[in-house]
């Protein structure tokens, strides 16, 4: 489940593995962005966002008989800044540059039972943002993206490993500074 609102600046993600499947994994992502056309012939664009976030995640790997090779699960959350530029030939946006800021990464193996954790914080902290070179002929889509990954592998028919990750973000402001280079 994922949602994003440019109007409110809120992002919400929830990702959960299918407990009936032996192997399952996937990403949930949501983002908000802005379109920018540089006002200088050549310049450095520095994209920044002001955000607060809260996360919760859980892994439950039940015990299995000693003859079973293993069962494991992992989850992680990240914030990403992404710059996409319009390709003048195709007219499509193409990813030019991205920066990932890890929030957490956890894993568990057979029989570790229920593990849950959470946290909160603010972005950018010490992160310098995302800088890209461009000019007045370019059009950029600059994105703030929240992403969670969950994955599991069960190797016993009755094992029901559960892996879940939730991430909520509030992004009240995003901005771009243009520094002329010509």
Describe the predicted segments one by one.
Residues 1-182:
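Mature extracytoplasmic or otherwise solvent-exposed domains
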């Amino acid at each position: 489940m994922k949602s994003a609102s440019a109007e409110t600046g809120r992002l919400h993600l929830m990702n959960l593995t299918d407990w009936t499947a032996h192997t399952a994994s996937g990403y949930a992502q949501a983002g908000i962005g802005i379109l920018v056309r540089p006002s200088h012939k050549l310049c450095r664009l520095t994209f920044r966002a002001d955000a607060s976030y809260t996360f919760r995640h859980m892994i439950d790997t039940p015990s299995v008989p000693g003859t079973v090779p293993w069962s494991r699960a992992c989850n992680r959350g990240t914030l990403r800044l992404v710059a996409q530029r319009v390709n003048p030939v195709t007219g499509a946006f193409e990813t030019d540059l991205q920066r990932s800021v890890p929030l957490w990464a956890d894993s568990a193996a057979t029989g570790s039972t229920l593990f849950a954790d959470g946290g909160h914080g603010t972005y950018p902290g010490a992160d310098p943002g995302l800088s890209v070179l461009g000019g007045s002929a370019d059009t950029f889509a600059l994105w703030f993206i929240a992403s969670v990954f969950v994955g599991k592998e069960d190797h016993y028919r009755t094992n029901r490993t559960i892996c879940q990750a939730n991430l909520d973000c509030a992004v009240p402001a995003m901005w771009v500074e243009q520094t002329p280079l010509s």
